[in-house]
């Protein structure tokens, strides 16, 4: 049994780029001779074992190499212009990083006012000469996690606790559902919105609403809160993590996680800033570049690991993507024709509908 698990784990690691490649970048010591101040802010905390911590760990890993002084600001509001102004004028930051979708308008305003400061917006949708928005194709990892969840469910009913119904979140819900239905066509994904990215109480309430009313045996999340995982664990319900691998907290019920690694991107962009090569743009990073991946898991059987590997290889070969038609919405309307696919712009900004199999319970 142990041998089969090890083989399945190796297959999964290979599929998701988990075979570690140490990438040594020759850093121009002239541009890193002086300390560069980087200001980064988020709507939660940086040691949250979730979204905030993934950014913290990436920047800390680069601090010595790139000679950075990093100023962390937690619980920044959506209207964070005053915080940005303080980081630039009082703290002397040359690079500003915002870690919430909600910061778009404030960062746009600041970027226009401070043209010699560089802005990086995680999960944003705007860009200008000194301002880039960036994200990874996390929907691909979501699809793969859906395969894992679809193979694990016995009831065919799964839950999804999500923060807000914007295009980014709905894209993830839809991708997860399509992954589930690729192996369990009769499955239903019940969605509850907790209306918060970070708060435990509403995330727990959404989880309770789903688990108390439906025979759900797997839950997935798009929230930074650990509360849904804790509740699922207390009931013996499987959970699918997001942002960071937290299987050490829930070893018996944490099925798999869709995780971020920002290190390569931050190194590249900070060096571009220091070398005068930065040009603002919308960056949407492919899975094979290492920004998004699926965590290893001791709870996968061989068949599931092979299915994940095969789907991942299709992504890497560009022979398949999640939103290739035909795809119907949950009202029965054909949204994507056979032989067609959604454009990047449609996927980034146009998701206001759900695929077949999703029911929103709010």
Language-model features: locations:
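Positively charged n-region of N-terminal signal peptides that target proteins for export
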Residues: 1-4
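Hydrophobic membrane-insertion alpha-helices, especially the h-region
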Residues: 7-20
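A residue-level marker of the well-folded mature domains of exported/periplasmic proteins
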Residues: 20-362
């Amino acid at each position: 049994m142990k041998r089969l698990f090890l083989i399945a784990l190796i297959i999964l690691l290979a599929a998701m780029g988990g075979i570690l490649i140490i990438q040594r970048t020759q850093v121009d010591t002239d541009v890193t001779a002086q300390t560069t101040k980087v200001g980064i802010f988020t709507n939660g905390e940086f040691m949250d074992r979730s979204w905030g911590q993934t950014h913290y760990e990436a920047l800390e890993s680069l601090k010595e190499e790139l000679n950075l002084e990093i100023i962390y600001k937690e619980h920044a509001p959506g209207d964070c212009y005053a915080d940005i102004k303080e980081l630039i004028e009082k703290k002397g930051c040359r690079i500003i990083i915002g870690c919430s979708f909600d910061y778009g308008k404030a960062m746009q305003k600041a970027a226009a006012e401070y043209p010699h400061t560089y802005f990086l917006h995680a999960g944003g949708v705007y860009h200008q000469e000194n301002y880039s928005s960036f994200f990874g194709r996390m929907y691909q990892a979501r699809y793969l996690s859906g395969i894992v969840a679809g193979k694990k469910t016995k009831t065919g009913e799964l839950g999804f606790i999500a923060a807000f119904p914007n295009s980014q979140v709905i894209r993830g819900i839809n991708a997860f559902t399509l992954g589930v239905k690729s192996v369990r066509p009769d499955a239903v994904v019940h969605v509850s919105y907790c209306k918060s990215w970070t708060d435990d109480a509403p995330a727990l309430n959404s989880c309770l609403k789903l688990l108390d009313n439906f025979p759900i045996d797997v839950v997935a999340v798009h929230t930074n809160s650990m509360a849904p995982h804790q509740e699922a664990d207390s009931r013996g319900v499987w959970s699918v993590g997001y942002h960071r691998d937290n299987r050490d907290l829930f070893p018996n019920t944490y099925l798999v996680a869709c995780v971020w690694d920002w290190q390569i991107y931050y190194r590249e962009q900070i060096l571009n800033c220091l070398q005068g090569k930065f040009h603002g743009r919308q960056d949407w990073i492919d899975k094979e570049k290492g920004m998004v991946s699926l965590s290893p898991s001791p709870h996968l059987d061989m068949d599931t690991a092979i299915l994940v590997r095969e789907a991942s290889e299709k992504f890497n070969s560009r022979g398949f993507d999640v939103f290739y038609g035909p795809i119907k919405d949950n009202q029965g309307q054909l949204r994507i024709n056979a032989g067609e696919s959604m454009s990047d712009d449609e996927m980034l900004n146009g998701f206001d509908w759900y695929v077949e199999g999703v029911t929103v319970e709010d």
